[in-house]
C-alpha cells in the first residue's frame, strides 16, 4: 500500500530552510463541496543539514496536552535555534481533533490502529498512509504525544513498544530518560499492531510516545511535563542545544 501515491498534498517544502506553516490537504468530496478538502495543520522548521524529528499529537482528538504543547512550540521555535529539521503535526487526525473525539466522526476509525493506512481508503486510512509514507519515511526520530482522552486518566508516562533491534531499543531508552516523565515503560510489541509505533519500526525511526493525564481536560502539571519533555527530547535527538 505504501508504494501507491498519497492523495494528500501540502504546500510545505520539506527541503527549504526556515519556518513554514500550512496544511496537509485531505480530500473530502461531499454533497456541499465536490472538490472539498480538510486542513491538517503542519509546520516544518529547518536549518541546514542534520537529523529529522517528527512530532505528532492529536492522533486521538480528545487528547489535548500534546495539541496545546505542539501548537505553542510552532510559535516559539526559531530556525536559528535548531540544526536539522523538525516537522510538527499538532492535529494529526484533524476531523477527530476538531470534534474533540477519540475517533473520527467521518469514518469512526481510530487512527492509531490502522497503519500503514490506505491511499484509496476513507479519510483516516488516507491520513495514516500519508504519515507513514511521507513523514515517517523521512524522519530519524519521532515523538507521538498521547493522553487518556475523555475515558481514561494516565499517570504521566513515556512509553514505547519492545523491539528486536537492540541499538534502537537503547536509543529509545535514552529518549525516555531525556523526556523525564515521572514514569516510563515498554509494552509488548504485539500490542503495537496498526499503531504509530509499528509504523515507525517499519521505517527504522526511533520513536517514543507519551500518556499524559487525560479525563478530557488539560492540567497545568501535565502540560508542563509535556512542554519541558519535548524540549529535552529535541536536545537528546541533537536538533537543538541545551541552554546554559
What are these language model-derived features?
Residues 1-244:
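Structured catalytic-domain cores with a bias toward divalent-metal coordination
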Amino acid at each position: 500500500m505504501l508504494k501507491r501515491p498519497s492523495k494528500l498534498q501540502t504546500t510545505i517544502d520539506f527541503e527549504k530552510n526556515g519556518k513554514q506553516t500550512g496544511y496537509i490537504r485531505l480530500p473530502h468530496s461531499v454533497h456541499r463541496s465536490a472538490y472539498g478538502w480538510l486542513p491538517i495543520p503542519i509546520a516544518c522548521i529547518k536549518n541546514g543539514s542534520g537529523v529529522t524529528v517528527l512530532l505528532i499529537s492529536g492522533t486521538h482528538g480528545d487528547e489535548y496536552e500534546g495539541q496545546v504543547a505542539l501548537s505553542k512550540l510552532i510559535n516559539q521555535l526559531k530556525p536559528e535555534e535548531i540544526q536539522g529539521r523538525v516537522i510538527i503535526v499538532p492535529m494529526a487526525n484533524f476531523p477527530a481533533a476538531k470534534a474533540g473525539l477519540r475517533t473520527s466522526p467521518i469514518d469512526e476509525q481510530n487512527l492509531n490502529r490502522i497503519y500503514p493506512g490506505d491511499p484509496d481508503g476513507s479519510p483516516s486510512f488516507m491520513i495514516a498512509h500519508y504519515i507513514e509514507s511521507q513523514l515517517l519515511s523521512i524522519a530519524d526520530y519521532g515523538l507521538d504525544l498521547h493522553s487518556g482522552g475523555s475515558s481514561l486518566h494516565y499517570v504521566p508516562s513515556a512509553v514505547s513498544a519492545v523491539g528486536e533491534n537492540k541499538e534502537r531499543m537503547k536509543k529509545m531508552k535514552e529518549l525516555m530518560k531525556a523526556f523525564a516523565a515521572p514514569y516510563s515503560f515498554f509494552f509488548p510489541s504485539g500490542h503495537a499492531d496498526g499503531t504509530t509505533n509499528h509504523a515507525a519500526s517499519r521505517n527504522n525511526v526511533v520513536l517514543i510516545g507519551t500518556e499524559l493525564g487525560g479525563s478530557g481536560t488539560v492540567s497545568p502539571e501535565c502540560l508542563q511535563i509535556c512542554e519541558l519533555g519535548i524540549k529535552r527530547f529535541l536536545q537528546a535527538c541533537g536538533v537543538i542545544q541545551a541552554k546554559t
